[in-house]
Amino acid sequence: MSAADRFRAAARDRDPARAAAEFADDIRLYNPMSAEPLAGRDAVAAALTGLDEVFDDFEHVQVLTDPDPGDAIAETQAVVFRARVGDHTVEGIDLLEVDHHDRIATFTVFARPLSALQALGQAMAARRPSH
């Protein structure tokens, strides 16, 4: 069982701390809400915890695996997901790249539709403490 497999099991169980244990220290999270990636285990873990709090009915619906993606990465999994944010259904793909230390080094999120991403952005912004 690879880091990506363990991550998916933790996500299914809605256990963000266990999921974050599969991240490399220098993981990069690329997401549709920002032009720049989040970097580092703590920042990505915080984002994952926030998503867990705003997503309803999160499920992985399909997994595509490339067990030999090249020299720099040990494994790549494209994980198709579905979730709800309020009245909106989010559909997307988590692209997980596992390094040779069996840790998720790169996590790229592709999601649609725009209305669901806007609802997600509003829900995540509402979680941030105001100054």
Predicted regions: what they are:
Residues M1-H131:
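C-terminal and inter-domain tail/linker signature
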